[in-house]
Amino acid sequence: PVYEGDSSPVVDIQSGATIGFKYLNFGTEGASKAELTGDIPAGFKISIRIDSYDGKTVSVAEVSEDSKTVVFELGEEITGRHAVYFGFNTENAEDRAVFDCFRFE
């Protein structure tokens, strides 16, 4: 498929997938919430970890209905420079998600 704009979404995400980004600078003021945009089917549980794929979990969101946006409240304010990993899990092995973009505030 061809996508408009400067980026393309990550597609066909299945349970057990992890998508990581190195390195994000949260600055000194930090972030206390995050937002993920895409096509996320109901039943997905998405976790945000920092510093490594099996690092500290800073937030988990359970998607209760098909969503275009998932909002995360971070367990603590994140400051400084960190790698960020989004983990996707669901009990329905047939479900697939699409990850378009994210932001931290």
Task: Report each predicted region and the residues it spans.
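Extracytoplasmic
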Residues: 1-105
